[in-house]
Regions:
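Structured, active/binding-site neighborhoods that engage oxygen-rich ligands
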Residues: 1-176
Length: 176
C-alpha cells in the first residue's frame, strides 16, 4: 500500500476505535462502536494519514449500516479487531454483536468468541502451548494464512503453539 514506516493497518485503526468506544462509554456499546468505525471509514479517524485499505465486507457493512452475514462474508476483519474485548467483561453475546457490526455470519462471530477466550486464558497466566496445544508440531506447510476468518484463527493459534517467545511468534505470523 506504499505507506510510510510506522503506519498501522485498517485492523489496528478499528481496534483503536473499539478501545476508544469502551473508554468513552465505560461499556461495550455497539452503536457507539459502529459510529466510530464509520468515522474511521469516512473521515480517516484512528489513522496516521487517512484510510488506505478496507476489506470488502467491512466497507459494505459500514456503508449499508448492516453487518454482512453471507457465507462469503467471513473475512478476518472482525477477528483482527476483537482483542480489546478480552480485557473487558464483555459476554460472548456482546463479542458476537461487536463482530456482527461488520461480520455477522456465525462463523465469524464464533471465531471472535473463541479468540477472546484464548486471550483471556493467556492474560490469566495460561501458557501459549496450553491454549493452542492441539497445533503443536503441525508442519507450517499445513497452515494457510489468508483472508478467511478460520484460516487466520488457525494461523494465529499455530504461531502460539509453535514458538517460544513473543518476537518469534510475531515473526512466524508475518512469514506465514
Amino acid at each position: 500500500h506504499n505507506q510510510p514506516v510506522g503506519t498501522w493497518s485498517d485492523d489496528t485503526s478499528m481496534a483503536l476505535a473499539t478501545c476508544d468506544s469502551i473508554r468513552a462509554t465505560g461499556r461495550v456499546d455497539m452503536r457507539d462502536m459502529r459510529e466510530r468505525f464509520v468515522r474511521w471509514y469516512r473521515e480517516g479517524a484512528y489513522t496516521v494519514s487517512g484510510l488506505f485499505d478496507i476489506g470488502g465486507t467491512t466497507a459494505d457493512a459500514l456503508s449499508s449500516g448492516c453487518g454482512r452475514a453471507g457465507e462469503r462474508d467471513n473475512g478476518n476483519g472482525s477477528l483482527m479487531r476483537i482483542l480489546p474485548l478480552a480485557f473487558t467483561d464483555a459476554t460472548d453475546d456482546e463479542v458476537r454483536a461487536v463482530s456482527a457490526i461488520t461480520h455477522a455470519h456465525t462463523i465469524s462471530c464464533e471465531a471472535c468468541v473463541r479468540m477472546v477466550h484464548v486471550a483471556r486464558r493467556l492474560a490469566a497466566g495460561e501458557g501459549p502451548h496450553d491454549v493452542a496445544g492441539s497445533l503443536t508440531g503441525v508442519p507450517e506447510s499445513e497452515v494457510r494464512s489468508g483472508g478467511f476468518v478460520l484460516s487466520t484463527e488457525r494461523a494465529a493459534l499455530w504461531c502460539l503453539a509453535n514458538t517460544s517467545s513473543y518476537a518469534e511468534c510475531v515473526l512466524a505470523a508475518v512469514n506465514l
